[in-house]
Amino acid sequence: MWIASKFGFFSIVRKGEGKCHVRARIREDLENLIAASGVEAEILTWDESDYRHRVIVKESVVEKVMATLAETLDYDNFKNKIIDTPSQSDKASTYGEIWSMMYSYQSA
């Protein structure tokens, strides 16, 4: 699943029984997510991977991360929140493009 949040952009996938990879293109995004959720996880960097940075965690950690995302929801407009968040503002135009592309499905 892809998650775009005020902490960063992530891809979460299941890799084997009970294990998940929380992946990011930018290390700081994982650092933000770990700090916000209070989980303990080692960030691994795999230079040859599609998503360079990741943590490998139990499903229960992903559940805690998802709860943190819900509990820290403090905005009524995602794009504006990204613009106002220094560690994420450089992603604003990209998120705008994603919004526009997905809007075209709604309009079709």
In which residue ranges do the predicted regions lie?
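Structured alpha/beta or helical-core interaction and ligand-binding surfaces enriched in interleaved
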Residues: 1-108
